[in-house]
Swiss-Prot record, chain B:
Keyword terms, alphabetized: Cytoplasm, Isopeptide bond, tRNA processing, Ubl conjugation pathway
1-thioglycine sites (modified residues): G99
HAMAP family: Urm1 (MF_03048)
Keyword presence, Protease: no
PTM entry text: C-terminal thiocarboxylation occurs in 2 steps, it is first acyl-adenylated (-COAMP) via the hesA/moeB/thiF part of the MOCS3 homolog, then thiocarboxylated (-COSH) via the rhodanese domain of the MOCS3 homolog.
UniProt GO BP: protein urmylation; tRNA thio-modification; tRNA wobble uridine modification
Gene: URM1-2
Organism: Arabidopsis thaliana
Pfam families per UniProt: Urm1
Similarity comment text for this entry: Belongs to the URM1 family.
Chain positions of cross-link Glycyl lysine isopeptide (Gly-Lys) (interchain with K-? in acceptor proteins): G99
Pathway: tRNA modification; 5-methoxycarbonylmethyl-2-thiouridine-tRNA biosynthesis
Protein name according to UniProt: Ubiquitin-related modifier 1 homolog 2
InterPro entries: Beta-grasp_dom_sf (IPR012675), Mopterin_synth/thiamin_S_b (IPR016155), Urm1 (IPR015221)
Amino acid sequence: MMSNGGDSSEIVRELEELKLKKAEIEHRISTLEAKLQDTATVERYDAVSNGDSYLTAPELEHGLSPDQIYRYSRQLLLPSFAVEGQSNLLKSSVLVIGAGGLGSPALLYLAACGVGRLGIIDHDVVELNNMHRQIIHTEAFIGHPKVKSAAAACRSINSTIKVDEYVEALRTSNALEILSQYDIIVDATDNPPSRYMISDCCVLLGKPLVSGAALGMEGQLTVYNHNGGPCYRCLFPTPPPTSACQRCSDSGVLGVVPGVIGCLQALETIKLASMVGEPLSERMLLFDALSARMRIVKIRGRSSQCTVCGDNSSFNKKTFKDFDYEDFTQFPLFAGPLNLLPAESRISSKEFKEIFQKKEQHILLDVRPSHHFKIVSLPDSLNIPLANLEARLNELTSALKEKEDGHVNTGSCTNPSVYVVCRRGNDSQRAVQYLRESGFDSAKDIIGGLEAWAANVNPNFPTY
Amino acid sequence: MQFTLEFGGGLELLCDSVKIHKVNINLLNDSDILTMKDLLSWVRTNLIKERPEMFMKGDTVRPGVLVLVNDCDWELSGQLDTTLEDKDVIVFISTLHGG
């Protein structure tokens, strides 16, 4: 493998180049196709003005072109949707925030059904471990912005709609300006600060919010801030404790579960945009995939006491721009590394490799949950999950004792050190902090966890 | 009185990962009524096996937990003062944020 290092990096570079070129070409094709359609329409109008009206498309009051009539015919044939519904849809604009598990199916359906203008905002790039649920993306876009990938997919399904790309994170500084350009907002994000920020912004701008969430085997869906209904804060005035907020990347999710919720988000959005049916406002849909149960419950209406949408609210655009949502929810907008420990309590993955190679006496403690440990682990590591560390501290003590006893026989005099590892290097810091407080003065954390080990030491070590 | 209690959105992890509990709660005497406040303290004592702070804060549920009595938000029936009746279905659900 090492001897081919030069070749493979060359191949990777060329692949990247080709993929970029391919995306550019696809973009150019959809632009040209849209242009062609416009030209065709103009030519038809020219024919009308020349008096050949029996050879041209009839002028129709609803404004749908012959191509649109054909493309959307199955929706036009629905008596409850019909030409009015389609016409409203074509005039509407929708912003989908997040092109992940929820956003993927939502965007595919919204593009396909003919929402006139579709905005996509996300700061992230496509990763291999997204593919099982974020079905809008293809392998060719791994490493590229999710927005680019999602926009290309939407254009390839429907080249006649306008797709706006925002390759950036949504923040209080850009939210008002971006959201104000759309009729309906779809919250397909994955964290509490974003959810509060988006809801508050929708209240300020008077936009309906189609909000979905999914984790593990469960999903939830509702429409906020619609027709006098509640906003997110009416329902959840106080943020939950941080320990109750899990991300799919930490707790896992079955791909189809956000898929179901994302599809339902598209459905609620289509209903709002086309002004058809009864939106899921003041009601919430709860989906439990394992027991195959879907229940719709009645939730409270708008609260007159709500700090944002209530009667005496002083919340305005200025308050919004200055509001610290990460501080309010005690939760980061983006998953980033923790920095709990001083440098002397930490070592890098490369330094740990040397300890490994020199066969220095040590205990490697892996504090991940046991089902993570079963996926992959470093050799000779002891697994005590962080949650059980306090209760199972004696296991660490006896493991250390065993090493020390073994050591006496070899005549060495250094005490074995404790190195702590986890998946990304956050829990390992919490564990080291606890261990040092409990008298394990040699405890050190391996910076960046197993992900750093895979990135810097052993590229063949699986990450997940 | 018989009740069906359901836990979801991760709250089931606090009661041995069992989502649906059919329970029987006896009143002290016939004239007494049972409110949500009584039920919450019964649940905390009898069903919650770990991390009670993930279920309750003070004498009510922690922020981020929705309580539904017969598929209806307890805000609409009087929260802690909601009077319960035989065979009521009470759902405790933690709000999800993932996506």
